[in-house]
Swiss-Prot record:
GO terms for biological process: dUMP biosynthetic process; dUTP catabolic process. It catalyses: dUTP + H2O = dUMP + diphosphate + H(+). InterPro entries: dUTPase (IPR008181), dUTPase-like (IPR029054), dUTPase-like_sf (IPR036157), dUTPase_trimeric (IPR033704). Its cofactor is Mg(2+). Pathway: Pyrimidine metabolism; dUMP biosynthesis; dUMP from dCTP (dUTP route): step 2/2. GO terms for molecular function: dUTP diphosphatase activity; magnesium ion binding. This is Deoxyuridine 5'-triphosphate nucleotidohydrolase. Belongs to the dUTPase family. Substrate binds at residues 71-73, 84, 88-90, 98. This enzyme is involved in nucleotide metabolism: it produces dUMP, the immediate precursor of thymidine nucleotides and it decreases the intracellular concentration of dUTP so that uracil cannot be incorporated into DNA. The keyword Hydrolase applies.
Length: 150
């Protein structure tokens, strides 16, 4: 069954080149692909990271964020991913969006101009009100942390 998204939110975008505008690859995609804004190819050696410009600035509405997430194909085929995933672009940020890619592979990875390098996912933000407390309600899990379930 095909569903169209009638509930969308307009994100005003300033961009160096219209071809760099983020886009959804399929009708049900949650993430919009974002491209590298490079004048020439850029090499990321094995074990190294690079800050990749997108040539794009956004006006995200108050009460929202955009999360920067990896593209699964880059991770699977080249062991390249977004270093601080998910990255958060706050609603009050107006600078250029840049993506930190890291090469976990054994071969150098070449980022080409216009290459799809990450995905942008719009999300609503609910802010927490942290309140100083004397104690916390107990749970079955308790203080069991990393690896406690096996």
């Amino acid at each position: 069954m095909t569903q169209s998204y009638s509930n969308t939110l307009t994100i005003p975008t300033l961009i160096e080149n219209e071809e760099l505008l983020p886009f959804y690859m399929t009708p049900e995609a949650a993430g919009a692909d974002v491209k590298a804004y490079l004048k020439e190819s850029l090499e990321i050696p094995p074990g190294q990271s690079a800050l990749i410009p997108t040539g794009m600035r956004l006006a995200i509405p108050e009460g929202y964020e955009i999360q920067v997430r990896p593209r699964s194909g880059l991770a699977l085929k080249h062991q390249v991913t977004v270093l601080n995933t998910p990255g958060t672009i706050d609603a009050d940020y107006r600078g250029e969006i840049k993506i930190i890619l890291i090469n976990h592979g054994t071969n150098a990875f070449i980022v080409e101009p216009g290459m799809r390098i990450a995905q942008l996912v719009l999300a609503q933000v609910l802010r927490a009100n942290f309140v100083l407390s004397e104690e916390l309600e107990s749970t079955q899990r308790g203080v069991g942390g990393f690896g406690h379930t096996g």
